[in-house]
Amino acid sequence: MPPRKRCDTVFGMAHPWWVNLLIVVPFTSYLFWRREPVLITRAHLLASALFAASFGMVEGTVVVYLRAVLAAAAGYGASVFAVAQFSRNFNPAMLQSAVLPISLLRVEVCREAATMLMLITVAHLGAHSRRGRWAIFLWTFAIWDLTYYVTLCTTIRWPSSLTAADVLFLIPIPWISPVWFPLLVSTLCIAAVLHSRRSILGHGVTDA
């Protein structure tokens, strides 16, 4: 795989350039919902939040194991302490070098695809309308993402700063950005869904 440009953690630019467009998703979704509020009950929000938080912890744990493989290959060892030390020196370019065998990289791509399918399935089951399903998807994705980083922080003390570079996704090519970027997008997505739900309660919809 040819080397790719690292993200500029000083200015917060993600790569490829179109990854930066994710910041508009919560804003455009909120404007879309203002025209016609989505119908999501408290029970659906709670159930999907519990799923997302649990799944985020599983996702974070899997990444700890993946980094243990990378740490062992780089000579750090495979203990939690070694993984934490390796993570402090983690560079997204490591995923594009011989450190990670191409066979494992393909497995990781398949895992990411399965993750998206699971989140889409939960969104489909959690609402009946397209608006509602989109809201549930953003809600679960955001909570999953935040819990993922909380899991990494509590287990291997990573990221050490919000400007640390991270690989967000590998499909179709690696998405690289500073950690603060996905945290901001996820927080805004949660805020957009919650604010829209307040609008729902104001429209006389029964909350259950």
Please give the residue ranges for each predicted region.
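Membrane-interface helix-loop junction between the first two transmembrane segments
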Residues: 32-46, 62-75
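Interfacial segments of alpha-helical transmembrane regions
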Residues: 37-53, 126-143, 205-208
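Alpha-helical transmembrane segments of integral membrane proteins
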Residues: 18-19, 43-47, 51, 111, ...
